[in-house]
Amino acid sequence: MDNDGAAAEVRTVALDWARAVVSDDADRIAAFMAADWVMVSATGIATREQFLALVESGDLTHAAMTAASEPRIRVYGDTAVYIARVTNTAHYRGRRHDADEWTTDVFVRREGRWRRVASHVTDVAPG
């Protein structure tokens, strides 16, 4: 597959991931994650297990997740890097959080499927 085709696949997977996150269905979300997936944010590193446990318990829910910029996708063989500005509305332990973030996701193609292995979020600077 050429890089354009692979980039289109990654774009589709990223959109499907956003829909899965908003569904608040831990099994559906897990289907997009590699077993060793981690998320890096201002608070540190969260593992796949930690993230999914928050979703399963209902402590973390999402009402919206929308791309706010055209993504930048680069494919390097069976690895892809996806960067986009994303807005989302989440509730964490009952408190609403509206976020405007730059996200970087690293995907690896395994057994013909693109899976997230790492995600990093950075708040967009005000102004």
Regions found by a protein language model. Give the residues of each.
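A beta-strand edge to alpha-helix "cap/lid" segment located at domain peripheries
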Residues: M1-G127
